């Protein structure tokens, strides 16, 4: 029997296709060269939670019911990790989830900044995540949770720390005799919701301060020069 391939799904948040290039994202370009590259693909939902729901279920947002942010993934729908578990894979999720909390206050589950209940973790065996990562962290420093709800603090640039949690799984957290499916979900380059701007890596401010915007955004003045990082 042929050895089954390991799978790493590296997911960024609110990122345009034309921001992936050798200058800005050389490591993502390297992953694309060494991994599987889909050159003609599209998200079926422009909104954060619904787009994630589509990825985790394989169906449209109107089918799974997550058609807007703040609608938890229905427990009646079989999630992606279930099929990998059935196929003998070890499954892991690291980063932002955004599929467990209800939008309306006082109704349903609210775990935006608290542990995601086990039954709402999409059947991933290994869990290092927060439902709304921008509520538990800023560009630098914060916390996530393990699968049992234990708080895990981190210090440093958030994207780097999420990568470190993923590396920790690869080095010591996985079942070594199984192939693995690892879903890494970054918040970056999404803006920081509680003060409405993107917190970039401090060391890159001078490097990218005059980086040209995509042509269709040049007429929008915005405040990115003032608010980065």
Annotate each language-model stretch with its function.
Residues 2-5, 11-25, 132-157, 167-229:
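Active-site-proximal cap/lid insertion segments
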Residues 57-156, 192-206:
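Catalytic-site neighborhoods of secreted/periplasmic enzymes
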